[in-house]
Amino acid sequence: MFPISSTCRHAIAGLAVALVLAGAVPDTRAQMADPVHPMDALTYDEVNRTVALLREAGLADDGTRFPVITLKEMPKAEVLAWEPGEPFTRTAFVVMREDGETSEAVVDLTGGRIVSHEARPGAQPAIMQEEWDRARQATKEDPRWQEAMRRHGIEDLSKVSCAPMAPGYFPEEGFGKRRILRVPCFDQTIPLHPMQNRPIEGVLAIVDADTGEVIDVKEAEPVVVPDTAPGYGPDAIPARGPMKPVLNLTPGGSNIELEGALEVSWQDWSFHLRADRRSGLILSLARFRDKGEERLVAYQMAVSEMFVPYMDPDPAWAFRTYLDAGEFGLGYLISSLGVGTDCPHQAYYVTLLFPSDEGGMFKADRALCIFERNTGNPAWRHYDAGSGRLTSRPEVELVVRTIPTIGNYDYIVDWVFTNRGSIKVNVGATGFDAVKTVRSPDMEAETAGDDTEFGALVAPYVVAPYHDHFFSFRLDLDVDGPQNSFVRDLIVPEPAPAGSLRTSLWRLVSEPVGTEGRIVPTRNTHGEVWRLINPNRRTAMLKGHPGYQIEPGTGNTLSSLPDNDPAQKRAQFSSTRLWLTRYKPDELYAAGDYPMGEADRGLPRFIDDRQSIENADIVAWYTLGFHHVTRPEDWPILPTRWLGFTIRPMGFFDRDPSADLAPEFARPPSREDATQ
C-alpha cells in the first residue's frame, strides 16, 4: 500500500460530474452547482460553503485539514417520500484535523448554520496527502536513516524512494495516541515498473505524521538488493502481436439513460450513484419496474471496508494489516479508467469530484464507467427435440465500474444489473504483489526454505508474502419498502417416506431470524438460503411474500486469524460471512468510523444491543474474501482474480422477469434513416 502522488489531485473550480462518451466531444449535460436530488454528492459550491461557515464560526482556519466533507443524508422516510421537483434540505458532515486533534461538525447548508461541533479525542481519520509527503521527506532527511542506508550498501540516496504506510494498531508498542506512519523504502537505481519491486529490507522508519518527527529507525540485518528483478511493460517484456479486434459495440445507440447528477435508468432498472471519498461509490434507490410499478429493491449499497493483512512475522511486514477504506479511502485513491481496456469504447466515462484535504475539491478524470455488454451467453434457452425448435434470448447486462488503486493493488468493483432482476456484485483483484528481497535466487538455494516459509519465490531474490483480501459490503436492502424480515432456509436431509422408491431426500426448513447478529451456518445441514422478505405485502398472482436472496458465489473464504490477534480485533467483520443489523443512519462502516486508531468497533458494537429485526428496517453486511497464496504466475503483474456474490429475486416476481425479452436486437439505423 503506497501513497498517491500529489500530482494526482487536481484543484478545480468547476462542475462536479462530467460525462464523456468515448470518441465524442465531452457531453454538456453535467451536474450544475445546485443539486437536483437529495442523494446527490455535495457540489463544489456546497463544499466551499461548508468550509466558509466553519471558518466564520471560528472552528476552522488555514491550518485545518478536512479528511471528511460529505453529505449527511436526509432521514430515509423523507428521501423515500420525496418527488422530483420538490425542495429538500442539504447537510454536510465534516471531520477536521488540526494540531494533532480531531473534531466533527454537522453543517446545515440550507439554513446556513453550524448544527453541532464535537471533539473526538484520539480519533484517527484517514491518511492525508500532506502527511504522506511529510513522512517521506522527514525520513530521507533523518541522519539515522541515512547512516542505516549506507550500512546497507546504498550510497546514492537520491535513487531511493520511500512509501509511508498505515501503521496497523498495536497499543503495546507504546506510541499512545500519536499518529504514526511506518516508512519502508525502495532502490530506484535501475528504473523499473513497478517501482516497488526492489525493496530495501532491514530499514524501517517510524514517523509522527502530525509533527514530522522521526521517532525511530528500525534496522535489521542487510539483504543485498539484486541487480535486476523482472518488471512488466515494453522495456521488460516485449508485447506479442495484436489480436484481431474483439469488440462489444452498440451500433444502434445506447440503452442507458442518464439524468441529473448521476441518476441511471436501463431497461427496467433505475438507481442513483454518488461519489464518496471513503467508499468510492454509493449506489442508492435501486428500483425495478414491474408491470408499470417502480418497486424498491435496495435503499443503499456500498463497499464498507477492506482488510488486507500480510502473513509475514518480519517486523517490517507484520504491521501490514491494512483497512483500505478507513485508512486510505477508495474514492480518494480512485484511478482513471483506460478507454477500451478498463471499460469498452462505448461506455459512458464519468469524471468525478471529491472533497480535498484542504477543503476544496479534486478531480478524478474518467473515474467511473457505465456500460452495457452482451455476455455471449443466453439469458435463457431451450431446444425442443421433438419439433427441432430452438428458443433463446441474448444476455445483456449493465455494468457500473470503478477501480480504486490502493498502492500496489487495483480493485475492480462492479455492480452488474441483469434483466432477470438480479444484481451481481463482483470484485477483481489485480495490480502487482507486494514483495520482499531475499537471499535465494531459486528454490534449490540453501536459504530457500527459510525465505519461502511465509511466501512464494516469484523471481530470483524476490518473495511475495502470503496475505488475505476481505471486502465488507453494506447492503441496505429494502424489499418493497423498509419493513422486512430475514429468513434462513436450511437444506435438511431426511429419510424418504415409507413406500417410496427412494431412501432419502432433502427438504427446506425455514427459520426466521428475530434479532441482530452474525449468521453462522448451522451444522447438520447441507447448505442454506438467505433471503429478506416483506411480510406486509403479497405478490399479485401467487400471494407469496416478495423477497430477495443473498447468494454466495466465489470468494467465500473467511479470516483464519483468532479474535485476539491485534489485526483481527480491528477487522472482526472478516470472521463471518453475513451480519444483520437494524438500520441506523450512523452505522456505516464495518470496522468503525476511525479504524486506524482503535479496535473492537463497527459490527461487533452494532449488534451489542441485539435489537429486533423482525418486520424491521434491516441492513445486511456481506463479507467477500480469499487467502492469496502467491505463486510465480502472479509476477510481474497480477492476472485479475474475480470473486463475487449475487442479490437475486426469490418470490419477488410471479414469473421470470426476463421471459419477455425480444428474440433479437433492434435493427441499427441505416444511413438512409439518418438522412431522413
Which residues make up each language-model segment?
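Domain-scale selection of a single, long terminal region
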Residues: F2, L21-P26
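Bacterial N-terminal signal peptides that target proteins for export
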Residues: F2-G14
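Bacterial N-terminal signal peptides
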Residues: A11-G23
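Boundary at the C-terminal end of the N-terminal hydrophobic targeting segment
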Residues: T28-M32
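Short, non-transmembrane alpha-helical segments in secretory-pathway proteins
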Residues: P38-L80, M128-F170
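Exposed beta-strand-loop-beta-strand "reactive/processing" segments of non-cytosolic proteins
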Residues: D61-T110, D156-D208, Q267, V400
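Extended effector regions of multi-domain proteins
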Residues: L109, I114, E118-I127, R150-H152, ...
